[in-house]
UniProtKB/Swiss-Prot annotation:
It is a multi-pass membrane protein. The chain crosses the membrane at residues 123-143, 210-230, 257-277, 312-332, 359-379, 387-407, 438-458, 508-528, 549-569, 591-611. CDD domains: Dpy19L2. This is Probable C-mannosyltransferase DPY19L2. The lineage of its organism: Eukaryota, Metazoa, Chordata, Craniata, Vertebrata. Probable C-mannosyltransferase that mediates C-mannosylation of tryptophan residues on target proteins. Required during spermatogenesis for sperm head elongation and acrosome formation. Also plays a role in acrosome attachment to the nuclear envelope. The gene is Dpy19l2. One of its GO terms (cellular component) is nuclear inner membrane.
Length: 773
C-alpha cells in the first residue's frame, strides 16, 4: 500500500566535489604457590593412610583386586585400638566432608565459569550487533548525503545506478514487475533485450543470484504487508530547482530502489559485526576487535566503496569472504575440527563465488597461501586434504547452480585444486626426487605452479573460454605490459589503474601501515625460526608450527592482497580490510606477551587508538562533509525522448554505461553493455565503439546494421575525453588499428554532419541520437 502523497520542497545542497597476560600470570602464580602446599601435606596424607591401612588390615596390604572396606564388627577394644579407631573415624568423616566440599566447590566454579562464558559471549555478540548497526547507519548516511536519495524520483534513482549497476538492477526490476516470481525468473533466464537479437541466460552470465533472492524477498514481504493492509511506502511531490519540473518521490519498503539498497547496506552492516567477532577470535581479546573496527572506520574510504556504488558484485560477495576466512581461521587453529566447520566453509565459499566472477581468483590466492604451509608443515596433511575436498565441492556446487558455467572449471582456482590433490597423492614418489628437505619443498612448489598454469591453459581450451577476460588476464597484462583494445578498455578505467601513490601515505597517517609492519615483522621472525628449526636441526616442532598456522596464513594472504592492490587499485577492497583484521594482533598474547607482562596492554591499545583517531576522525569528518544531490538532466531528457519517440522494439547501441541506463529505464533492446568479460560481447563492443575510431562512416554503418542497430547514442565527451595519456578513444584505436591512424576522427565528422549514412534525430548538451539509414 502507498501512503498519502504530500508536497515537499527539495532542500538545496552543495554539490559533491566529484557527482589477557594478567590472567595467565595469576594462574601461574597460583600453581606455583599450591605446589609447596601439596608437598608439605603429602607426608601427613601418607601417615593417615598408613594408619588407616594398618588398622583395617592389621599391617597387611590389600590383596590384588580387593576393595577397601571397614570391618563389620570389633570384638574387643583396648585403649590403643580405641584411639586408633577414633582417629580412623575422624579421618573417614573428614575425607567424606572434604570430598563433598570439594565437589560442591568444583561445581560452583563450573557454574561461575559457565556464567562468565555466557556473559562473555553475550558481550561479544552485543558489541558485534552495536558496531554492525553503527556501520549500517554510517553507510546510509554517506549514501543519502551524496545522492539526496530520499528526494529523488524513481527515474532519477535508476539513473544513479550507472554502468553495470544499472544492468544488475534492471533484472531485479524485471522480476518484481512480472506477474509472478517464476515468470520473472524465466524472463531473465531467457533475456533478449540485453544482447539483441541473442537470447541469453542472464543469471548464468551476470551472476544474478543476489537480485533473484532480493526480488523474492521483496515480493514476499510486500505481499504479506498488502495482505494485512500495512502501508509500505509514503510518497511526496518534490519541487525541484528551475527549470526542472515537479516529481514524485517515495520512501519505505514498498519502493523497489529503497528496498534493494537497504538489503545491501544491512548485509554490509552485518559484515562489520562479523569483523569484530573475527578479529576478537584471532587476537584473543575484545580489544583486538575494537582495534579492527576503529581501523576500518578510520580508513573507510580505502576499504570499501559500497556507500557510493551499492549494486556492484563485491557488495554482495565480500561479506561472505570475511565469513569464509573466519571459519578457515577456526579450522587452522583448532586441533579437532567438526564436520559443521567444513560444511560452513563450503557454504561460505559458494556464497562468495556465486555473486562475483572475480571471486575465484581470490580463492586461488588463498590456496596459494595454504599450500606452502602444508609443504613446510604448518597444517596437518589430513586437515589440508579436507580443506581441498571442501573447495572442490564448492566449485562443483557453483558449476551446477550457475547452469554449467564453464568459467568455474577453467579457472586458476579449480586447476590449482586438482594439482594440489595430485601432489598430495603422489607425495611419497615426489619425495624420492629430492635429497634434502629444502629440495623437497622446492620440487613441490615447482610442480604446483607449473601444473596449475598448464592445467588452466588446457581446461580453457577444452571448455572454449580461452578468449574470456578474467582478473588473472588483467594482472598478467599489467606485469607483462601487454596492451590491446580490450585490456586498455579495462586498464584505462581509474579503478583498474595501479594503486595511487597517496594510498600508502593515508595508511601511514592513520598508523595502520606502521602497525602492520611491526606485526608482520614478528610473524616473519617466527616463520624464519620455525623453518631453521626444521632445516638445520632436523627436529620437527609440530606443536609450535600448528599453533602458528593461522598467523602464517593471514601473513601470506596479506602479501597476496598487497600485490593485487598494487597492480589493480579496485582490489584495495581486499587489502585494507585484511590490514584492519591483522591490526587486531597488536592485542595477541603470543606476539606481544613479552611486552604486556611488563606494562598494561590496555594502556598500549588505547594509546594506539588515540593516535589513530587524530587522522581517523579527520577522515570521517571529510566523508560526512560530502554533500550533494544527484541530477543528470541531459540523460533524463534522452530517456524521456526514447520512451515517447521510439518503438518498443527499437534497438540501441552506444557507450556501455549509457546502454545500461537505457535498458533499465526504457526497456529498449541493446546490443552491448558494461559486463565486458565475455568474448562475444567484446567483439560487439568493438564494432559499436568504432564510431570513435578513424574508420570510414560507411564501414561503421554496415557493421552496425549487421548487429540490427536502429539508433546510435553518440556522446561528444567520448570523442575528446582523455583520463590519462594513452587512454582517449582515438589513442586506443590507434593502437588497435594503426592502418587508419592518418585518417580524421569519425566522431568529429558525425558531430558536424551525420549524413548520409546517419540522421540526427535527437540532440542536447551531452547526447546525440543518430538514426542509422
Amino acid at each position: 500500500m502507498v501512503g498519502p502523497t504530500r508536497s515537499k520542497l527539495r532542500e538545496g545542497s552543495s554539490d559533491r566535489p566529484q557527482s589477557s597476560c594478567t590472567g595467565q600470570a595469576r594462574r601461574r602464580w597460583s600453581a606455583a604457590t599450591m605446589e609447596p602446599q601439596q608437598e608439605r601435606s603429602a607426608p601427613q596424607e601418607r601417615t593417615k593412610w598408613s594408619l588407616l591401612q594398618h588398622f583395617l588390615l592389621g599391617g597387611r596390604k590389600l590383596p590384588s583386586g580387593a576393595r577397601n572396606y571397614a570391618a563389620r564388627r570389633i570384638q574387643s577394644l583396648n585403649a590403643q585400638n580405641y584411639f586408633q579407631l577414633e582417629e580412623v573415624a575422624k579421618l573417614l568423616l573428614l575425607n567424606r566432608f572434604q570430598f563433598l566440599f570439594t565437589l560442591l566447590d568444583h561445581f560452583r566454579e563450573k557454574v561461575q565459569a559457565l556464567q562468565m562464558h555466557r556473559f562473555s559471549h553475550r558481550t561479544l555478540f552485543g558489541l558485534a550487533i552495536f558496531v554492525g548497526i553503527l556501520h549500517w547507519l554510517h553507510l546510509i548516511t554517506l549514501f543519502e548525503n551524496d545522492h539526496h536519495f530520499s528526494h529523488l524520483s524513481s527515474l532519477e534513482r535508476e539513473m544513479t545506478f550507472r554502468t553495470e549497476m544499472g544492468l544488475y538492477y534492471s533484472y531485479f526490476k524485471t522480476i518484481i514487475e512480472a506477474p509472478s516470481f517464476l515468470e520473472g525468473l524465466w524472463m531473465i533466464m531467457n533475456d533478449r533485450l540485453t544482447e539483441y537479437p541473442l537470447v541469453i541466460n542472464t543469471v548464468k552470465r551476470f551472476h544474478l543470484y543476489p537480485e533473484v533472492v532480493i526480488a523474492y524477498w521483496y515480493r514476499t514481504i510486500i505481499g504479506i504487508m498488502n495482505l494485512f493492509g500495512i502501508e509500505t511506502k509514503t510518497c511526496w511531490n518534490v519541487t525541484r530547482m528551475e527549470p526542472l519540473n515537479e516529481v514524485q518521490s517515495c520512501e519505505g519498503l514498498g519502493d523497489p530502489a529503497c528496498f534493494y539498497i537497504g538489503v545491501i547496506f544491512i548485509l554490509n552492516g552485518l559484515m562489520m559485526g562479523l569483523f569484530f567477532i573475527y578479529s576478537t577470535y584471532l587476537s584473543g581479546s575484545q580489544l583486538g576487535g575494537l582495534i579492527t573496527v576503529a581501523c576500518y572506520f578510520f580508513n573507510h574510504g580505502e576499504a570499501t566503496r559500497v556507500m557510493w556504488t551499492p549494486p556492484l558484485r563485491e557488495s554482495f560477495s565480500y561479506p561472505f569472504l570475511v565469513l569464509q576466512m573466519y571459519i578457515l581461521t577456526i579450522i587452522l587453529r583448532t586441533s579437532t575440527v567438526h564436520k559443521k566447520h567444513y560444511m560452513a566453509l563450503c557454504f561460505s565459499n559458494v556464497a562468495f563465488m556465486l555473486p562475483w566472477q572475480f571471486a575465484q581468483f581470490i580463492l586461488f590466492t588463498q590456496i596459494a597461501s595454504l599450500f606452502p604451509m602444508y609443504v613446510v608443515g604448518y597444517i596437518e596433511p589430513s586437515k589440508f586434504q579436507k580443506i581441498i575436498y571442501v573447495n572442490m565441492s564448492s566449485v562443483a556446487l557453483c558449476f551446477i547452480l550457475m547452469f554449467g558455467n564453464s568459467m568455474y572449471l577453467s579457472s586458476y582456482y579449480s586447476s590449482c585444486l586438482l594439482v594440489t590433490w595430485a601432489i598430495m597423492q603422489k607425495k611419497s614418489k615426489i619425495q624420492k626426487l629430492g635429497g634434502t628437505e629444502l629440495q623437497f619443498w622446492l620440487i613441490q612448489g615447482c610442480f604446483w605452479w607449473c601444473g596449475t598454469i598448464i592445467l588452466k591453459f588446457l581446461t580453457s581450451k577444452i571448455c572454449g573460454v580461452s578468449d574470456h577476460i578474467r582478473l588473472s588476464d588483467l594482472i598478467a597484462a599489467r606485469i607483462l605490459r601487454y596492451t590491446d583494445f580490450d585490456t586498455l578498455i579495462y586498464t584505462c578505467a581509474p579503478e583498474f589503474d595501479f594503486m595511487e601513490q597517496a594510498t600508502p601515505l593515508r595508511y601511514i597517517k592513520t598508523l595502520l601501515l606502521p602497525l602492520i609492519l611491526v606485526i608482520t615483522y614478528l610473524i616473519f621472525k617466527k616463520i624464519v625460526r620455525d623453518i631453521m628449526c626444521v632445516l638445520y636441526t632436523n627436529t620437527y616442532v609440530r606443536k609450535q608450527l600448528l599453533d602458528n598456522a593461522e598467523l602464517i596464513f593471514h601473513t601470506l594472504q596479506l602479501l597476496a592482497f598487497t600485490g593485487l592492490a598494487i597492480l589493480i587499485m579496485r582490489l584495495k577492497l581486499f587489502l585494507t580490510p585484511h590490514m584492519c583484521i591483522m591490526a587486531s594482533l597488536i592485542c595477541s598474547q603470543r606476539l606481544f606477551g613479552w611486552l604486556f607482562c611488563r606494562i598494561h596492554f590496555e594502556n598500549v591499545v588505547f594509546g594506539i587508538l588515540t593516535m589513530m583517531s587524530i587522522q581517523g576522525c579527520a577522515n570521517l569528518h571529510n566523508q560526512w562533509s560530502i554533500m550533494g544531490e544527484f541530477t543528470n538532466l541531459p540523460q533524463e531528457e534522452l530517456i524521456h525522448w526514447i520512451k515517447h519517440s521510439t518503438r518498443p522494439d527499437a534497438v540501441f547501441a552506444g557507450a556501455m554505461p549509457t546502454m545500461a541506463s537505457i535498458k533499465l529505464s526504457t526497456l529498449r533492446p541493446i546490443v552491448n553493455h558494461p559486463h565486458y568479460e565475455d568474448a562475444d560481447l567484446r567483439a560487439r563492443t568493438k564494432i559499436v565503439y568504432s564510431v570513435y575510431s578513424r574508420k570510414s562512416a560507411v564501414e561503421v554503418r554496415n557493421n552496425l546494421l549487421k548487429l540490427h542497430v536502429n539508433y546510435y547514442v553518440l556522446e561528444e565527451a567520448w570523442c575528446v575525453v582523455r583520463t590519462k595519456p594513452g587512454c582517449s578513444m582515438l589513442e586506443i584505436w590507434d593502437v588497435e588499428d594503426p592502418s587508419n591512424a592518418a585518417n580524421p576522427p569519425l566522431c568529429s565528422i558525425l558531430l558536424k554532419d551525420s549524413r548520409p549514412y546517419f540522421t540526427t534525430v535527437f540532440q542536447n548538451s551531452m547526447y546525440r541520437v543518430l538514426k542509422i539509414n
